[in-house]
């Protein structure tokens, strides 16, 4: 669970994330099993390398204080359709029958970033509803770092 903390932590910071080491201190850290006070999270090269109390950080580490905050592991969304927009905004028929695949992908990029910033580090995306294999391309773009988004488990 600890490896899923990073994307949730990064959601609190301005994008893009810095590659320099980062020592993050919050009031509490939930590691997926227990709540801890006085713990820190050390991130290096985009990866969590240590979690615990009184961590030794490199001299050049950026120090991020998050008073009053609780750090959590990333959430997993078990049923998503990143290539669909809410039906109260655009009907299913209009999206699937009238919108271009390119337009739907552009909107899915926005949905992917919003999902990540909400703390969801993994989504199980259950199909594109008429956008072919666009979810495969979106997953690849996220994995290669072209766009921010959660890890995608796709069902195409």
Model-assigned labels for residue ranges:
Residues 145-156:
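Metal-coordinating catalytic core of metallo-dependent amide/deamination hydrolases
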Residues 69-146:
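Metal-associated gating/positioning segment near the N- to mid-region
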Residues 27, 41, 46, 68, ...:
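Divalent metal-coordination and catalytic microenvironments
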Residues 4-16:
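Bacterial N-terminal signal peptides
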Residues 64, 124-125, 154:
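General beta-strand structural signal in soluble alpha/beta enzymes
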Residues 17-21:
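Boundary at the C-terminal end of the N-terminal hydrophobic targeting segment
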Residues 29-31:
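Short solvent-exposed capping/turn motifs at the termini of beta-strands
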Residues 33-72, 142:
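Histidine-rich, glycine-flanked metal-binding segment
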């Amino acid at each position: 669970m600890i490896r899923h903390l990073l994307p949730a932590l990064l959601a609190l910071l301005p994008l893009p994330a810095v590659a320099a080491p980062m020592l993050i201190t919050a009031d509490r850290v939930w590691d997926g099993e227990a709540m801890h006070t006085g713990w820190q999270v050390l991130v290096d090269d985009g990866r969590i390398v240590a979690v615990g109390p009184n961590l030794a950080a490199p001299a050049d580490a950026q120090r991020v204080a998050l008073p009053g905050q609780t750090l959590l592991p990333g959430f997993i969304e078990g049923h998503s359709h990143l290539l669909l927009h809410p039906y109260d905004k655009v009907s299913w028929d209009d999206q699937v029958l009238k919108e271009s695949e390119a337009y739907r992908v552009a909107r899915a990029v926005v949905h992917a970033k919003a999902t990540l910033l909400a703390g969801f580090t993994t989504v199980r995306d259950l199909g594109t509803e008429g956008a072919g294999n666009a979810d495969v391309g979106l997953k690849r773009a996220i994995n290669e770092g072209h766009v921010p988004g959660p890890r995608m488990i796709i069902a195409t």
